[in-house]
């Protein structure tokens, strides 16, 4: 069998744009605000407090009150990672302990 009788191999590559994690930023003050809305496709969510003030988070059907809910300490983070039977697709509200413009980074796992 000569080399011309062998099947030709073709190099293939396939690139898919990564959509996860999807990042966003919320700036919080001393009033409860929506930090992220509901997403049916969300498998998990990570909240990162890169600021110097404590931030409190609650599901969007509640009003955030400082210190009453999921507390994210300064330079800390909180992760909610789903599985086949648990998802974290609700919206979230947040509030800062004091001041304004306090950053909350959000990574959505889609």
Residue positions per predicted region:
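Beta-sandwich interaction modules
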Residues: 36-37, 73-90
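Edge beta-strands of jelly-roll/beta-sandwich modules across compartments, strongly enriched
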Residues: 55, 99-110
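Short, surface-exposed beta-strand/strand-loop-strand elements in extracellular ectodomains
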Residues: 48-69
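Short, intrinsically disordered N-terminal pre-domain segments
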Residues: 1-21, 107-110
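Surface-exposed ligand/attachment interfaces on beta-rich extracellular proteins
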Residues: 14-40, 52, 65, 100
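Noncatalytic modules at the cell exterior or secretory-pathway interfaces
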Residues: 43-45, 84-102
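Intrinsic-disorder/low-complexity, polar/charged segments enriched in Ser/Thr/Lys/Arg/Asp/Glu/Gln
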Residues: 11, 42-44, 77-79
